């Protein structure tokens, strides 16, 4: 009972970001996030993003099954943590919504999730070269990114996270990290609950949707730069130290990036 209460308290604490946001506003922000991810090349026709419902952290919002660039607030559907639609009349959803529901179950501190197939990240999931932070905008990658091996779950699959069991296995691989790779598939990025105090850089409490979009984008950019550095340096790369990654990870919630990206998809 104490564990359940503690988890719920953590969930509710994570929603300081949403005090001024209604569910309708969060849906609109999610639609904008999807269009940004598409505009910046993080997703194409495939990929998805979600955010917890600020009024009910045991539910999350996700678009119906359509290309991210086409999403509007009217396309956003509410799901419970079993990834079942709240409304009996909900339109068809994504097959891989279990990625999101199972991560939210396992990680009460996670407020938003992005799953993406950016080509830049794929090589790091199929080789013995770990994805590590190479520049200051990717400090959130920490000491390296874990890789989800779907073969370890048992029966052969088509690589997709089609059920809660596969989603839970992915969540275990993610652990307490911000990013995990899926071998031969893509990656997942998560935004943790913002701190109660305002960010020391921006003076504002970070918005998890802005954070997770920034993490997905800069994971893609870091992978691209790391590949170039490996080729240029013959495999010898000067990565961020653990301290540098930790300190660089305390960015301003990518608010400046979000402001630019939002203006670009709003024109």
Which functions belong to the PLM regions below?
Residues 11-19:
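Hydrophobic h-region of N-terminal signal peptides that target proteins for export
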Residues 20-267:
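Glycine-rich flexible loops
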């Amino acid at each position: 009972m104490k564990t359940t209460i503690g988890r719920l308290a953590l969930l509710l604490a994570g929603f300081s970001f949403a005090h001024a946001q209604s569910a309708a506003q969060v849906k609109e922000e999610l639609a904008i996030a999807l269009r940004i991810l598409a505009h910046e090349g993080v997703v194409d026709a495939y990929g998805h993003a979600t955010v917890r419902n600020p009024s009910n952290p045991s539910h999350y919002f996700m678009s119906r099954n359509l290309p991210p660039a086409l999403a509007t607030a009217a396309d956003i559907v509410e799901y419970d943590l079993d990834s079942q639609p709240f409304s009996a009349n909900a339109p068809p959803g994504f097959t891989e919504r279990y990625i999101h529901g199972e991560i939210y179950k396992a990680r009460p501190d996670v407020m938003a999730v992005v799953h993406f197939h950016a080509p830049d990240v794929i090589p790091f999931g199929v080789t013995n070269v770990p994805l590590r932070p190479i520049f200051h905008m990717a400090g959130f990658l920490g000491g390296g990114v874990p890789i989800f091996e779907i073969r370890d779950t048992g029966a052969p699959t088509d690589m997709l996270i089609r059920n809660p069991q596969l989603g839970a296995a992915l969540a275990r691989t993610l652990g307490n990290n911000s990013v995990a790779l899926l071998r031969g598939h893509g990656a997942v990025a998560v935004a943790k609950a913002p701190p109660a105090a305002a960010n020391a850089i921006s003076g504002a409490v970070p918005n998890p949707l802005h954070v997770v979009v920034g993490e997905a984008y800069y994971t893609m950019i870091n992978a691209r730069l790391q590949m170039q550095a490996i080729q240029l340096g013959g495999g010898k790369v000067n990565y961020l130290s653990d301290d540098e990654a930790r300190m660089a990870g305390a960015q301003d919630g990518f608010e400046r990036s979000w402001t630019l990206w939002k203006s670009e998809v709003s024109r």
